[in-house]
Structures are given as structure tokens and as C-alpha cells.
Amino acid sequence: MIRISLDLMGGDFGPQVVIPGAAKALDRHPDISFVLYGLKEQCDPVLAKFPKLREKSIFHDCELAVAMDEKPSQALRRGRYISTMWRSIAAVKTGDADVAVSAGNTGALMAMAKFCLRTMANIERPAIAAIWPTLKGESIVLDVGATIGADAQQLMDFALMGGAMARALFEVERPTVGLLNVGVEEMKGQEEVKEAGRLLREANIDSLEYSGFVEGNDLGKGTVDVVVTEGFSGNIALKTAEGTAKQIGEYLRAAMSRTLLARIGYLFAKSAFDMLREKLDPSKVNGGVFLGLNGIVIKSHGGANAEGIAAAIEVGYDMAKNGLNQKIENDLKKYHAKRLPPMGPEAA
């Protein structure tokens, strides 16, 4: 049984969307049980519509919910110990849940997760990993917003964590990893990126295969299983991809409704357009994973619909079931053990 703690008040729509999303996830994975955190008056009427979910859940009434526009520092001061967001994270720390899921304020969620769970040994800063649709299927991109301006060692740590996530999610034995850069040549790019490339080449890590530098146009190609970058460029890439998907969707809608002939043509090509719409639907790949913490936290898009919430829950389910944090800890331990100077008689 995978136990998931869920912040019912997170996101733009709160329990009206989060609860139906949880019900969808439960239908697909009957071995999930939920620990729900919400405001009773708002949640009870919605929960009553989903008796199966209510039966597989424990509900905790909380004092407050973190606002979507609340500053992280304010949310931490005001909501520590008593908010739906904090308590959903704390359930992972106490062992009452295997993973926490929230569609709430990203900055507040990261601040609370870092404060409550703390970072793993040898991890200076956590990262947010996004699942990215590609021509070959899916890949992982990190960091997409947690760490702005990462140094070479932090990028190296991101590569290790991203590789562990790829093994947990895609079930590949040795995922390929690339560093996002302005070119594939070794002399190009910022010093931090070039140094991270050197570290990855020389580390000769058993759990991943370093494939060198990749460019922005490789993100959608699926050139590698994991793309590593720092949070500023990663977040811009993510938002650009989301905006481009919406733009293409709007272009198609406008083109297909412009004339009677276009509308007739759409009817003949409907299955192809439905397939494209499915590929461009952000809810299908919803769920950013906070990596590097002593516990698994999943961030859903704030504007996600019920299908998107279900997808984020399923990401958490997969991560917990496949032992994500154990894989990360093992990989970090092996890598940092190699970096330590020899001790005792061997050092002589």
C-alpha cells in the first residue's frame, strides 16, 4: 500500500479539483491510501461525492491554507505546523505517508519542504525535476526553478539525482544524461557547465551514461533520458515549452474553424488532431518532483484539472513504489565515497 498525503487546498481550484483528481488516481491504483489535509467546511461536501475515496482516506481538518500569491517567508511563518501544506509534508517526515502532493504555491512548498524534511547528506541545494514529453516518449529535465545559478558540483549532484529518477520512472538500467548548453562543443558555455561536464566525464558513474552537452532543440527530441541545467534556464525552457504548446493549440483551433471546408476537413482528420491534442495536453505530464530532500514531495501545476492532479499523484506513486530516495541516496553515497581521500594504511 502506497500512502499519499494530499494538500486539498492547493492550486487555483482547491478541493473542487484536487478531490476528484485523487478519486481518479485511486480508480487506477487501488493500492493507494490517502492522508488528506484540508479545511473541513470546504472539503466535506466534495468528499461526500466520492465514497470510495472517503473510505480509503484519513481526513485532517487544518487551521489555514497557504495562498497562491503568498511569499514563501510569510507562508512559512504563518503556516508552519498548522497549514494544509505543512502538515501534508510533515506526514512524510513522521512516516505517516510515503509521498506528499500539493498544487499550492511553488515557493512556499519548497520553503516548507526544505525546512521540514531537510536536504539529504551531500546535497547543498534541492532541484525540481519535470517530466518532459519528447518525440521518443518522455525525458526528465532538472532543475526547473529551485536553484538559480548552480555551480559545477551542484549540477553534478543534479545529474546523479536525475539519473536515479529516470531509473525509478522509466525503469532503464543506465539512463543517458546531458548538460544543457549553448552548443555541443566542449569549449562552449559557462565555466560552471564546462566544469560539470569534466566532473561527469571523469566520474565514470555506473548508474548513468554521460552523453555530453545538449542544446535547447534536443529537449523535445528526446536525445537523452535526463537533461541537467540550473533553475533559471530550466524554468525559462519549461515556460517556453508550455507557451508553445498553447500557441500551437490556438493556431489549430483557429485554422480548423475558419471556413466550412476547414471544419469538414477537421471531421475527417479528427483522430489525428485528437492524438496531437493529447500530446500537447500539459495535464498528461503534470507533477514536478522535489529532489534532494529526505522525503518525496510532488508539485502539481496550480491550474491543473482533475486529470492533471491524478497524473501528479501517479508520479508520486511511481516514485515511492520504485524507491526513488533510496536510489538517490545510494548513488550519492557511491559517488562521494570515490571523492574521499584514502584513509589509514592505504593512504601511506
UniProtKB/Swiss-Prot annotation:
Keywords: Cytoplasm, Lipid biosynthesis, Lipid metabolism, Phospholipid biosynthesis, Phospholipid metabolism, Transferase. Gene3D superfamilies: Isopropylmalate Dehydrogenase. The keyword Lipid metabolism applies. Pathway: Lipid metabolism; phospholipid metabolism. GO terms for biological process: fatty acid biosynthetic process; phospholipid biosynthetic process. InterPro entries: FA_synthesis, Phospholipid_synth_PlsX-like. It is found in: Cytoplasm. GO terms for molecular function: phosphate:acyl-[acyl carrier protein] acyltransferase activity. SUPFAM superfamilies: Isocitrate/Isopropylmalate dehydrogenase-like (SSF53659). It catalyses: a fatty acyl-[ACP] + phosphate = an acyl phosphate + holo-[ACP]. GO terms for cellular component: cytoplasm. It is an enzyme of class 2 (transferase). It holds the Pfam family FA_synthesis. PANTHER family: FATTY ACID/PHOSPHOLIPID SYNTHESIS PROTEIN PLSX, PHOSPHATE ACYLTRANSFERASE. NCBIfam families: plsX. Belongs to the PlsX family. Homodimer. Probably interacts with PlsY. This is Phosphate acyltransferase. It comes from Rhizobium johnstonii (strain DSM 114642 / LMG 32736 / 3841).
